[in-house]
Structures are given as C-alpha cells and as structure tokens.
Amino acid sequence: VCGFTYVHAHDSLWNIKTSDYHDAYYGTAVGNGGIGILPWKEPFSIKQIVLNHVFDAGAPHEVSRLIRGINPFSMNVKVDGQVVDGTHISGWEQCILLKEALHQTRFVYANKLEVSYNICALRSMPYAGLVQVKVKALAPVDLSVENGAEVPDEYLQPRIQRKSIQDYGLHLKLLRTSALTRHRNLQVSATSAFIFENDTKVEESDNKRNIFTKYLKTGEDFSFALLGAVCSQRDFIDPCNESDREVIYGAKEGVDRLMDLHLEQWNELWKGDIQIVGDDEAQRAVRFALYHLYSSARSGSRLSIPPFGLTSQGYNGHIFWDTEFWMFPPMLFLNQGIARSMMDYRTDRLKPACQRAFSYGYRGAMFPWESDDVGEESCPTFALTGPFEHHISADIAIATWNYYCMSRDIRWLREDGFPLMEQVAEFLVSRAEQNEDGSYSICNVVCADEYAEGVDDNAFTNAAARCALQDASKAAALCGIKAPVSWNAVAKGLRIPKFSDGVTREYEGYDGQIIKQADASLLAYPLKAITRPEEIKRDLLYYEPKIDKSGPAMSYSVLALQYARLGDGEKAYELFVRSFRPNQLPPFGVISEGAG
C-alpha cells in the first residue's frame, strides 16, 4: 500500500490514455494467463472476470462456453454518504500502462476527494488480482468503502462466508463467495480482503459485505488495497479453501512485494518486444497486440489462447486455427515458454482428436474446429465449420514442426511432436481421395474462406495438408522412423486448382465470389507453397479486391507481409495500416474482428 504511485502517461509508446468520460468506451482487460479482469469507465467498476479454460455449457445441452468468474473486486465507495459514481466527477483519466500491465484511473469527486487507483492481474499469482487505491481529501470527508462479490447469472447457490485471520502478524477479514456453475456444477470460489498500511477496522455490513470507514481531514492522504483470488475446480479439488489461501499468502507477502514480482515478470516478458522506429502509431498498435497475447497466456500452463484472449466470452473462449496460424508465430519468436504451452495444449488433446477421426470413419487425429478444455468438438451445430473445416489438423501439425525447427528439442519431437504429426498425417491420407488420373482430392470441405462451404479441392486446405505430410516425413527421418510411402504420394498428388492465367483458384468451381478472408493467398505465406514472385503477385492482385470489406482484419496483415517480402514497401505499409486502423475501437484502440 505504501508503495502506491500514480504513473503519468509520459511515454506515449508504452502508455495509452483517455480523458473523455463521455466518449464511446470499449474496455481493455488486464490479465496474467490465469484470469482476465476487465475494468470499465465508471469509478471502481469492473465489468467482468474471465477464467482461462474454465467452461460450462452455455445453455442446457448446448456447447461449452468460457465462464465469467465470480468478481471479488466489487467496491461501493461513498463520500459523506453519497455513492461515488460518474455523476459528480471531474478530471477523469484512464491509462493503460503496457510495460507494467496496469490499468490506472484517477478523478476528483465532488471537489472533495482526489482519487487514483490501479488494477492489475498479478503476474506472479495466476489466480489473483490487486486493486490499489489512494485518496486525498480536498475538504473534510467521511469515507466508507464496502467490498462484496458479484456473482454472474451463470451460477447457482452462491454462498457467502467471512473469516478472520489473526496470526503471524496478519489481521485480515476474508470474504469468500462460492457457487456452482448452472449446467455442469463446477465449483468456483472468490475470496477478497482489504489490506492497509496502518490498522483500520473492517466490519460486516448489513448485506454481509466487508466495510470500513475513515474520517479524513483536509489535505490528508489515505491508501488501501483490495486483494482477490478466483479459483475453480478445473485447477483445484478444493477451490474454496484455495482462494482463501491465495489471499492469505498475498497479504503476508505484502503489496510492495507482490508488485515487485509482478513488474519483474512483466519486464521479463517484454524482453520479447517488437521495436518500430519512426512510426509511433504502429509501435503502439504492435505493443498493444503483444500486451494482449502476453496477458492471455503463460509459460508452463499447458494452455492456449482463444480469439478474444481473456477479455470476454467471445467465440465461447474456444481454441481455433487462429491460435496456430496467427498467434503462435510471434510467441515462437518472442517467448518460447508460451509457445511451448500452446503446443502442450494440442499434444495433451491428441487422444480425443484420434477418437474424433475414428467417429467419422477416418484414421489418425482429426482435431476439432473449436476446442474446449477436453479437446472435443465444441462448435455450435448451426455452423458447418465444426464437421467440415478440416484444415485445422494440418495447421496444428505445421505449427508443431515449426516449434521443433525453432527449439531444436529432438526429445520433445520424439515424445510429443512427432506422435501428433504422425496421427495428423494418417488422418490426411485417409481424408484424401484418389482420382482416375492418379491425383488426390480432399472433397466437401469448408474453406479458410468460410463463405465457401461444401466445396472440393480448396487451395489452402490441400496446400496445408501437403505441407503437413511433407513435414511429417521430415520429422519421421529425424526420429529414425521410415515414413509410410502414402504420405509422400498423397502430398505430391494433392490438387491445387488454377485459373487459365495461372492465378490460384480458391477451390474447384470458384469464379470470383466475394471471400470472407484470405485463403488462396496463404499459399505464398505462411505455407510457402508458392515461391515465384510473379505467381505471388498475380494471386495478391486477384484476391485483394475480393475480400469482404467487413471481414476479419487478419487478411490484410498477411497480404502486407507478402508485399514486404516482394520488396513493395509502399503497398505493404498501406495494407499493414489497413489491418488494424479501421478495426480500432475507442478509447484505447482495442481491435475488433471486423472493420467499422
């Protein structure tokens, strides 16, 4: 508590600031790879807590959905009996400190009280968060602060318990709220406690919350902290007592120690930085993207990153191809510990992928389009992507080979990597059909361009399958295993459709329709299945105008990269900016999936 300082946003390349309280607002979460905390603009408001890879059904007999956690950080602050809300504040300002992973707010309430507070998800404690508050009285005031837990509606039977801890120099009033998820009866527990620099009496309010009061004279400063932890049965047999222990441990460590460890670990993460000279906008955008990736993952977790990270329940928190094709590569270069966890997520779920292939009449491993914690298909049944978007298995195998190429961990390749690649290769061989001319087709798929359903010989699906089969053969040789002849035969024989002028045809029968996102253009990069510059340029010129203007931003990023590789810096920059600027949301620049 005594270590609290409000860091001013003087470094515009690391800090993102807003001061218009009435502007449209899309919040930015703080996360530590275990929990995500989403602060909002109203004083002391936290919109939701997201728990990494903790799932319940979205509705009876529906697919799994990432759950919101019980929020132990809810505070009701009053000054002279009036609730501190957005109606009587001035000088409001929020700042996201990317380097420190802090969400800061400050304002003046009713010309009586200066308020500043930090919110962080503690990097050193993956199930815990900390709110640090500092106030200064501009006039004599009576301050009261009440803490309780907010229980989202996806829970049943919430139970509140209070406990006093007075031992080893600790004087804590723990407030624990536990409940069961509505459909799968998973227990979640959240515990919180106030921490003070000096003795301050905490009492029980009429509604079973913790509350303290403080009289402040003009000019008097006062600081306190609120430490909270959220645990679930996914990670603990006894989440109730564990959430208590986390808070007790953190309180005994002390706020200064917790923050030192938090900042130390974020400094280590930022050794994996991308530095851009001469373009402040691009520098902030790239660091903001890295911040979200680092906030959503951690080394050693054996977990991956969903499309919305730990900010929301978007796409139900499932794991898609986005992970291996778009999020994994920067982690592979910048933080191999996180990249390894993303690989562990897939190798840990090889068995259900094999069971899925078996259930559809194939050999090997058929990974789900949308994977939840157990690794089974979790795509809603109204979408054909679940049964038919089969390039996901090849994407995972390609990422597996890339991890080996970067890490050169031959033991991992033998024990974990190659077994996955082998099973994917067997699936792809069993999925391919031989034509009369000896070539091979993969029929009836959903393309990477998901507007195209039930088509044959999708260029990206077939090229990804070819790469996965070729990589599996290389891995087999390194492991001292002779690859089946069928792997090479199918890889060589897979059809890649072409127009008469040499442009890659997205699928057999494609005739220039609008596409959702890049598909055939991915053959040049990252698949590197097309290497001649004139062929790459033909595909770029043909497909860029075909991309739906409201489609995902990922298309323009990969087109920009290809133009850069061709040496066309001006066009590369145009598309690079287009990949994020139209998708930025106020006030911090959070990226939406679609433009506008």
Q: PLM features: what roles do these ranges have?
A:
Residues C2-V30, G34-Y315:
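Acidic/polar, glycine-enriched structural segments that form the non-catalytic walls/loops
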Residues F55, N71-F73, A101, I392-A399, ...:
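Amphipathic, well-ordered alpha-helical segments in soluble domains
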Residues E268, G272-D273, V277, E281-S296, ...:
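Long, charged, mostly alpha-helical binding arms that flank functional sites
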Residues E281-V286, T311-D322, T385-D395, L413-L420, ...:
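Secondary-structure capping and boundary motifs in well-ordered enzyme cores
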Residues F288-S295, Y345-P352, P419-R431, C467, ...:
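Alpha-helical scaffold segments in carbohydrate-active enzymes
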Residues A297-T311, G337-I398, Y404, R408-E415, ...:
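Helix-terminus loop motifs that line ligand-binding clefts
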Residues I319-R349, I398, C405, E415, ...:
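Active-site core of glycosidic bond-cleaving carbohydrate-active enzymes
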Residues Q423, F427-I481:
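Acidic/histidine-rich catalytic neighborhood
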